[in-house]
Amino acid sequence: MGRCGRSNDGVIGGVRPYVRSPVPRLRWTPELHRSFVHAVDLLGGQYKATPKLVLKIMDVKGLTISHVKSHLQMYRGSRITLLGKPEESSSPSSRRRRRQDNEEDHLHDNLSVHARNDCLLGFHSFNFREQTSATDNDDDDFLNIMNMERTKTFAGNGESIKFQSHHSLEAENTKNIWKNTWRENEHEEEEELSLSLSLNHPHNHQQRWKSNASSSLSETSEAVSSSSGPFIFRDCFASSKIDLNLNLSFSLLHS
């Protein structure tokens, strides 16, 4: 069995007694903690930072390496607790502070997640709307082109129909003009022939000239009625005019 009691060096039960230092213990103020966190972040995080380097970066008078070491261990433990591991036994104020920090971190994470989701949703919806509008514009452009082509086709057909109708109308007007001109010329020739016969010749010759003129005119009328064009009308009229002139000159010589 082991020995119990006081040893020669004053150690009770083999455990070294706690000796309180006459110097007051250093208190970690918020400013000192912010300086500590800044030093840890500069060193690349809580697992890459060492107490010696943190102490050197902080450069605070009265701060020892043991203070930094204990605070770094507590800081690592608090970070582990925030990640979901069992919470170490500490004071109520520390637990309340860590709970507040946890709630703030959780709220920040949720806001970050929602912001990222909103950004992603906005990005995808923007791309989708942009692609949809581009497709609709392409469809609208295609439909507009088709409508323009159809309008041009209808307009071309309308112009051709209008041109054809206008051309046929001009041809009909020309034909009517030729008919009216031929009828007027025929009427004038009849009047001139009747007047010349009545003034220059006796009554019997006048009757004969009238009969010859009427027969020639009847033949001319038959020729004109059998023809079907303004140019044929003019040719028939010209030939009948020549016959009438020949008959008239022959009769005058005999008289």
From Swiss-Prot:
SUPFAM superfamilies: Homeodomain-like (SSF46689)
Residue spans crossing the bilayer: none
Single GO cellular component term: nucleus
Xref: InterPro entries: Homeodomain-like_sf (IPR009057), Myb_dom (IPR017930), Myb_dom_plants (IPR006447), PHR1-like (IPR046955), SANT/Myb (IPR001005)
Localization terms from the record: Nucleus
Molecular function as annotated in GO: DNA binding; DNA-binding transcription factor activity
Pfam family of the protein (one): Myb_DNA-binding
Binding region for DNA: 51-76
Source species, domain of life: Eukaryota
First-listed, main subcellular location of the protein, grouped into a coarse class: nucleus
Keyword Lipid metabolism: no
Keyword check for Transcription: yes
Residue span(s) of domain HTH myb-type: 20-80
Biological process terms in GO annotation: regulation of DNA-templated transcription
UniProt entry keywords in alphabetical sequence: Activator, DNA-binding, Nucleus, Transcription, Transcription regulation
Residue ranges of the region described as Disordered: 80-110
Reported function: Putative transcription factor.
NCBIfam families: myb_SHAQKYF
Protein name: Putative Myb family transcription factor At1g14600
Species in which this protein is naturally found: Arabidopsis thaliana
Lineage: Eukaryota, Viridiplantae, Streptophyta, Embryophyta, Tracheophyta
